[in-house]
Structures are given as structure tokens and as C-alpha cells.
């Protein structure tokens, strides 16, 4: 059974959750304003797009499998960003409280 955005924001340390399309259109969000969700989705879409380009290039040059992308994680300052489902579903979390492994697994559902 897929984990809902409500379930995600109820996980320890998770502040907000969101989903978006490859072009950065925010399709759903929890615990954040519409305006902030739109900005988050646009920025995360850009990062996902960059990782997709890097992975394609690495695959071609190294003849190793780097695609398809499953997701990415950023940790900086006191916050963590975790994206899964190809980099189109994610959460922002408090780094000191979140279990990256647990949230990553829940996002992959």
C-alpha cells in the first residue's frame, strides 16, 4: 500500500511533503503554503533534471548502469531533503530527528 503525504508528514522529523511532475508542476503537498510548495517543486524538479542528465552521461561514458534515477538526498544546515519515485516525490525534514532510511523507504512505496 502506498504511503500517503499525510502519512509522510506524520513521520518523525518530517516537516512537509510534496509531489510534482517532471516540469516542476506541484501536484500535491502537505504542511506548506501553495506558494512555497510551487517554489519547492520547481527547484526540486531542476535538481532531478540535472541528476537525470548526469546519470545519462555517466551511463554512456562508463558503460555502467546509472539510470533510471530512483531519487536523491540533500543534507545541509539543519535540514534534509529526501526525494524518491524517480525524484518526483519528496519531503523536507529536520536532520537531527529524521531517519533517512525509514523516510526513503516510505517515499518509495
What are these regions (language model features)?
Residues 1-109:
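Non-catalytic interaction/Regulatory regions outside core domains
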Amino acid at each position: 500500500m502506498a504511503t500517503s503525504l499525510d502519512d509522510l508528514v506524520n513521520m518523525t522529523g518530517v516537516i512537509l511533503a510534496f509531489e510534482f511532475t517532471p516540469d516542476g508542476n506541484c501536484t500535491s503537498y502537505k504542511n506548506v503554503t501553495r506558494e512555497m510548495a510551487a517554489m519547492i517543486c520547481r527547484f526540486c524538479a531542476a535538481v532531478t533534471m540535472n541528476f537525470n542528465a548526469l546519470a545519462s552521461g555517466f551511463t554512456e561514458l562508463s558503460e555502467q548502469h546509472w539510470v533510471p534515477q530512483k531519487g536523491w538526498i540533500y543534507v545541509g544546515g539543519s535540514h534534509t531533503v529526501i526525494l524518491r519515485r524517480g525524484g518526483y516525490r519528496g519531503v523536507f525534514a529536520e536532520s537531527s530527528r529524521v531517519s533517512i532510511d525509514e523516510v526513503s523507504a516510505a517515499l518509495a512505496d
